């Protein structure tokens, strides 16, 4: 079984498309939406879906992607925990493939290649650089739908409670004890936020993150990672 954990904060625009798309996936899984204090209709959207689909649960936790994902993992029942951003969709058949991996002890964790909706060449470049980095380092970003066996996740202490780059910090611990697999079928992230933020700024952000991770530079200011909704 897979526990899909979706941290949310003011995601009323993304969740109405992400949840139905996710629930079309066949497989043995549950969906845990963990809200961090949204002031829009995010909880209403999730609650309405949960009322009609027993696979879905809505939890509330203190704001912060790390604390929300950790809270979801504590309530998870699956062999796998998979962390999915609210504006990102899994490729077709992703969960049945992960179900099939469950008996294989050699596979302890992994993620997906990344892509954006739309056809902007600059966003394709962002994804290309991100995927190149990921295959080289095995450091999986949060928007690549990181999945890990629940017991291993717990043994590593979950995500560190830091405001940004909690996914990088966790994966730095993960790669010391496992070799995450990178699946070629890409997840697709809605390009809206990146277009609103500015695509060139998004590209610069990816490059700076790569520099920070590769050369152990100081963590970038939190404001540089602020979501655009």
What kind of feature is each model-predicted range?
Residues 1-3, 30, 169:
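Cell-envelope/extracellular polymer assembly enzymes that use nucleotide-activated donors
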Residues 20-29:
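Short, acidic, metal-binding catalytic loop of nucleotide-sugar glycosyltransferases
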Residues 41, 86-100, 172:
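Acidic donor-binding/catalytic loop of UDP-sugar-dependent glycosyltransferases
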Residues 93-122:
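Conserved donor NDP-sugar-binding/catalytic core segment of glycosyltransferases
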Residues 29, 43-77:
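Conserved donor nucleotide-binding strand/loop of the catalytic core
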Residues 21, 35-44, 88:
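A conserved acidic beta->alpha catalytic loop
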Residues 172-229:
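Hydrophobic helical membrane-anchoring modules
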Residues 81:
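Short aromatic/hydrophobic "clamp" motif used to bind/position activated sugar donors
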């Amino acid at each position: 079984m897979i526990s899909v954990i979706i941290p949310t904060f003011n995601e009323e625009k993304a969740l109405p498309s992400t949840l139905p798309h996710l629930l079309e996936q066949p497989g043995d899984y549950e969906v845990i939406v963990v809200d961090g204090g949204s002031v829009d209709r995010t909880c209403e959207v999730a609650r309405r879906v949960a009322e009609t689909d027993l696979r879905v649960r809505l939890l509330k936790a203190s704001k912060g992607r790390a604390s929300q994902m950790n809270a979801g993992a504590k309530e998870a029942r699956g062999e796998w925990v998979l962390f999915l951003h609210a504006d990102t969709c899994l490729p077709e058949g992703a969960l049945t493939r992960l179900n099939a991996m469950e008996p294989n002890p050699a596979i302890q964790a992994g993620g997906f290649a990344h892509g954006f909706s739309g056809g902007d060449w600059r966003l394709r470049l962002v994804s290309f650089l991100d995927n190149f980095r990921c295959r080289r380092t095995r450091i999986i970003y949060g928007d690549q739908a990181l999945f890990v066996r629940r017991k291993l996740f717990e043994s590593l202490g979950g995500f560190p409670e830091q405001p940004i780059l909690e996914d990088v910090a966790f994966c730095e611990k993960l790669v010391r004890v496992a070799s995450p697999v990178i699946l070629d079928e890409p997840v697709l992230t809605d390009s809206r936020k990146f277009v609103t933020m500015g695509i060139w700024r998004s590209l610069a952000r990816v490059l700076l993150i790569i520099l920070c991770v590769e050369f152990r530079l100081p963590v970038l200011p939190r404001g540089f990672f602020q979501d655009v909704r």
